[in-house]
Amino acid sequence: MAKVMQKYLQKGNYGGKEYIKEETIQKFNTCYFCKEGNRRGVGFDKPQLGTEGPTCGCVSLTSFGHTGFTGGMTWADPDKEIVYVFLSNRTFPDSNASNKLSKENIRENIQKVIYESIIE
């Protein structure tokens, strides 16, 4: 996952090879309906527009990523040159299990610690 996100961070390039055109990454990462209150791009989720959202609130507006049903999260921040990958399986042993990841903001809190440790 980290390599995939790094490829997106590098505008479609990885290891000296172009896998996706830069224009495609740009289109995926554009928030077309932010004015209407929808923070999602075509291919990626974007940072929250208010106080609620998928990130710690410390990421740049150019950042992008995805949170998954099983609790995983990937996020890339071009301005800060950071890739964050959180893998989990909150659905094990069943999908009705408690959702502590969301309720306690575990992914977002880890992301915040990473930003505070590296950036500040």
Language-model-detected regions and their locations in the chain:
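Catalytic loop of the DD-peptidase/beta-lactamase superfamily, centered on the K-T-G motif
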Residues: 1-120
